């Protein structure tokens, strides 16, 4: 029973983190190309370059 509870809790945490991901049309060649545009647009420099487009995260802990 404890394992099932932990599995549900882990799944909810993963889904909540994915909800903070914002897909954009900002072109990129590497993750470092995304930091500045994402910080300007979402006030958070957390980003990834995926499929040549920036994905910004808007869950910065210091906001």
UniProtKB/Swiss-Prot annotation:
Disulfide bonds: 28-49, 34-54, 38-56, 44-60
Annotated positions for site Important for activity: 50-51
UniProt keyword Secreted present: yes
Organism: Opisthacanthus madagascariensis (Scorpion)
GO molecular function: ion channel inhibitor activity; potassium channel regulator activity; toxin activity
Site (Aromatic residue of the functional dyad): 57
Signal sequence, start to end: 1-21
Keywords from the named record: Disulfide bond, Ion channel impairing toxin, Neurotoxin, Potassium channel impairing toxin, Secreted, Signal, Toxin, Voltage-gated potassium channel impairing toxin
Domain notes: Has the structural arrangement of an alpha-helix connected to a beta-sheet by disulfide bonds (CSalpha/beta).
Protein family: Belongs to the short scorpion toxin superfamily. Potassium channel inhibitor family. Alpha-KTx 06 subfamily.
Full protein name: Potassium channel toxin alpha-KTx 6.11
Tissues expressing the protein: Expressed by the venom gland. Only expressed by males.
Family annotation (PROSITE patterns): SCORP_SHORT_TOXIN
């Amino acid at each position: 029973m404890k394992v099932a509870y932990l599995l549900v809790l882990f799944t909810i945490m993963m889904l909540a983190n994915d909800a903070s991901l914002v897909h954009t049309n900002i072109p990129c060649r590497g993750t470092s190309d995304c930091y500045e545009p994402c910080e300007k647009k979402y006030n958070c420099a957390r980003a990834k370059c995926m499929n040549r487009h920036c994905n910004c995260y808007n869950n910065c802990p210091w906001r």
